[in-house]
């Protein structure tokens, strides 16, 4: 008998984010990525969707044209940049 383990945590995050976008609670990731491209040119390496301190956030890791890696944290409800940190 085969038993499935169920969706992976990343899949659950995706489903939760999609439901929140459809309900109008948060902005779609595409909107945030458009803003990131305009404000912080580079190549996106990773995106995470989380709930931190009572708010939904998109954490975006990118590499700029100088090869520096940055972690950006945006409020998923209003696209406000909450944190910008250069990774070492």
List where the protein language model places each region.
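Long, terminal "pre-/pro-" and other extracytoplasmic accessory regions
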Residues: 1-88
């Amino acid at each position: 008998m085969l038993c499935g383990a169920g969706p992976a945590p990343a899949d659950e995050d995706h489903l939760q984010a999609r439901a929140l976008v459809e309900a109008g609670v948060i902005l779609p990731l595409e909107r945030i990525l458009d803003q990131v491209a305009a404000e912080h040119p580079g190549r996106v390496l990773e995106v995470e969707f989380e709930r931190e301190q009572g708010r939904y956030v998109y954490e975006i890791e990118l590499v700029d044209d100088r090869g520096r890696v940055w972690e950006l944290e945006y409020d998923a409800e209003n696209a406000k940049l909450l944190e910008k940190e250069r990774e070492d």
